[in-house]
Amino acid sequence: IDLLEKYNYIGLKHLLRKRNILDFDLLFTEFPEHILPYDYDTYFASPERFVMVTTNCMTGEANYFEEKRDKSRVIDIVRASSSLPFVCPVTYVDDVPMLDGGIVDSIPLQRAIADGYTRNVVVLTRNRGYRKDTKDIRIPSFVYRKYPKLREALSRRCAVYNKQLEMVEQMEDEGKIIVIRPQKPVMVDRIERDVQKL
């Protein structure tokens, strides 16, 4: 947030110039290499798991990645995981077209449980009771025309997210997970530029 005003890495000018609302070169090259050097050696040496989720554009399903050896592959996965539909380009990981994992698995709690984790903490950006509007969303055939499964996933996204929220609230009520979330509705855009709001 502190760097948003100085570096201006979000906005329509990026979308118009590079077909990406985010300045990925700045975010994933300049920041980790020069501005805020990322300690890849410590990351690679850590025994902790770090799982990144993307949406496979060919299958319309979630892909989960762990990478602890190849720096450029880490960047590819992070770029894909950050590639928001409609405003960011498709990003390739291992020659497979990918977008943000939030399309199909916004809250990967089920995956954590399947991986054997029993003490989970879920961090949400919306207050309890929040639900997305689930009116029928039809993605026109010219949008992502090469990826019909992705279009299907995008049309189901809100319903899937709401179902995940229901599961989170139920498990929270049962004392099975800890949830960190705002107490009141948050009035910020998904890609917010106003530093005061953030």
Residue ranges and their predicted role:
Residues 2-198:
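Patatin-like phospholipase
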